Amino acid sequence: MWKSVVGHDVSVSVETQGDDWDTDPDFVNDISEKEQRWGAKTIEGSGRTEHINIHQLRNKVSEEHDILKKKELESGPKASHGYGGRFGVERDRMDKSAVGHEYVADVEKHSSQTDAARGFGGKYGVERDRADKSAVGFDYKGEVEKHASQKDYSHGFGGRYGVEKDKRDKAALGYDYKGETEKHESQRDYAKGFGGQYGIQKDRVDKSAVGFNEMEAPTTAYKKTTPIEAASSGARGLKAKFESLAEEKRKREEEEKAQQMARQQQERKAVVKMSREVQQPSMPVEEPAAPAQLPKKISSEVWPPAESHLPPESQPVRSRREYPVPSLPTRQSPLQNHLEDNEEPPALPPRTPEGLQVVEEPVYEAAPELEPEPEPDYEPEPETEPDYEDVGELDRQDEDAEGDYEDVLEPEDTPSLSYQAGPSAGAGGAGISAIALYDYQGEGSDELSFDPDDIITDIEMVDEGWWRGQCRGHFGLFPANYVKLL
């Protein structure tokens, strides 16, 4: 331990005082909630002020000002006291030798004011003896001698009209001199020169320069810009490439399709007219001899074989659902042959939403009607729904129809097959699968996207060139010529 600490006991007593935040015991909170919120009442030490009454404040200030002025007049010095100035009243303190304010002194005038004839300055001074003898009087008028050029205009050598030729610069040219600038060589002889197209001095032309007659045909440096979407997606770029290459072919196919649709429309009207005239029970359809070309016939490879047939009375309903289907694989076989020869994807078929809607409506409406088996359910339909009645009578006229009418409507295998797949294919096309031949990226939310060798199930043939199916959990439209049925 340090020596300074030995023998010393330091203890500091700390007084315990009350908390500064405690309120006084006699405090009474007489302030309302509104006054507490807005500080409308003054509290000592609160730092808040009460609302100001401006009228009361003005009166109070005016009264305080009057009181202050009265005190200043009473206690301050009085203006009447003093002896200085004109109004000083303490006369006993004034200087006895001082002149008062009522004294007016007369100042003597100057001699020039008392006698105007006196003085020697100026024009009218009369004291000539005092004027400067060498000074010129006011009556003197000095005349400046004119310059020689003012007296005789023929004098001088400057300018155009100067006559003193001896004073001029011998090397200077006169005003009568006209200088002629020598023309350039190209102005004197146009045949000279080597520049431009018509220069004749070929020996001066650059040997390595290309002549004007050797100019090649101008070519464009334009490069077609590739969109970001096409650059990022190989399938989209490939699709755009073949769409541009097959532009003419697609137009030709659209024209053929329009003609075919018009011909089919006329055929339908003729068949409907014949079906209305003929009223006879439906007969079993015999399989007609297949002609050389059947563009709209559904092959047996596409549909599974039919195991059972419905009674003849239900044939109108079968034909009603089957009617838009036969035109589906019209372009499949030629496109498949084309794809086998060429690995490039074909052009997309035209999007015809009108055709898709026409095909879909009878399929979805006719599906629930196949459930009841009794025959009377199928007979009254043609009376209530004339559109279905017209289409439903197609199978009954197979024997009476001529040529193309028999080709459009299939024999017994196709109607029975269509009816058998009605409940499933009509709603979703279940049971039909296909494998993708090319890569396709759907452009819209209702289109399907797939890669090569992908399996597409639940195919519904809703249009000639566009089918609807399911792939990778998505359901949508896709081009029929991009896939091959299994």
Swiss-Prot record:
Transmembrane segments: none annotated. One of its GO terms (biological process) is granulocyte colony-stimulating factor signaling pathway. GO terms for molecular function: protein kinase binding; protein-containing complex binding; RNA polymerase II-specific DNA-binding transcription factor binding; SH3 domain binding; signaling adaptor activity. The modification Phosphothreonine is found at T330. Residues 368-413 have a biased composition (Acidic residues). Changing Y388F: Strongly reduces phosphorylation by FES. Abolishes phosphorylation by FES. One of its GO terms (cellular component) is transcription regulator complex. Residues 27-66 are annotated as: Involved in HAX-1 binding. Residues 429-486 form the SH3 domain. It comes from the Eukaryota. Cortactin repeats lie at residues 79-115, 116-152, 153-189, 190-212. Keywords: Acetylation, Mitochondrion, Phosphoprotein, Repeat, SH3 domain. Phosphorylated by LYN, FYN and FGR after cross-linking of surface IgM on B-cells. Phosphorylation by LYN, FYN and FGR requires prior phosphorylation by SYK. Binds to LCK in vivo, and is tyrosine phosphorylated upon TCR stimulation. Phosphorylated by FES. Interacts (via SH2 domain) with FGR. Associates with the SH2 and SH3 domains of LCK. Binding to he LCK SH3 domain occurs constitutively, while binding to the LCK SH2 domain occurs only upon TCR stimulation. A similar binding pattern was observed with LYN, but not with FYN in which the FYN SH2 region associates upon TCR stimulation but the FYN SH3 region does not associate regardless of TCR stimulation. Directly associates with HAX1, through binding to its C-terminal region. Interacts with HS1BP3. Interacts with FES/FPS. Forms a multiprotein complex with LYN and ANKRD54. This is Hematopoietic lineage cell-specific protein.
